[in-house]
Amino acid sequence: MTSPARPAALSDSQLDRVEGVLLGQAVGDAMGAPYEPGDIPFTGTPELLGGGFGDYAPGEWSDDTQMSLYIARVAATGADLTSREALDEIARGFCRWVALDGASDVGVQTRRVLGAVVDSRDEPGIAARMRAAAADLDAATRRTGGNGALMRNGIVGLTRLDDRWATAASARAVAELTHADPLAGDCCVIHAEMIRSAVMGPPWRGGHLPAAAAAMRALDLIPAERRNYWRDLFDGGILSDSRCLEPPSGDGFTVHALGHAT
């Protein structure tokens, strides 16, 4: 697999932020998993309760972090995540996760895509077949904007810290393995750039984290024909702070999930 040049050495502060992305995803996932079905009342303080769709133990992370680990293992080699070899390895990992590694729970959309190709996982070109299965599902349903690609995306924002365009390309390429809706890819591009810029930017001094401003700055990475769609959403308050005060409802749509997560 192709290995692009490594970024310049990171400061201690930047390394702390990198670790925060990885640990924050795992801890936040474990904390949020029991609330996902919507049948547990929120008391104001999230707790590591366990349960959820995967009947998780308290403190156990869910399928989203499980999937992100397969991306992380490939990214850790220094591979270009847009390359055929890297995408094949990620796609093969997703299939192994479902077939062999004990996936605790799989989203409906992701399950359908992986189910279409899992039996051919060891044959060449698995990533291309997975993308084709995702495209077929989109053509059949026109409802492939689920949040699954976004939920596993955090690691991608750390893979090309010196190159925002390469980060964006990687985010879209990995998202498109299972999610053909362009909005799913857009969400992953915006999210990855928000992570990349937060890691590479100046140290946080406390106070408000300008999520909406960071998201707006990522819009040049989105195809021109959809920038106004995103600009209107951001201007309309999709990233409003008030959304963080209680677990959101109806965030299965990737656009809503991006707003709730930030």
Where do the model's predicted regions map?
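Structured, active/binding-site neighborhoods that engage oxygen-rich ligands
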Residues: 1-262
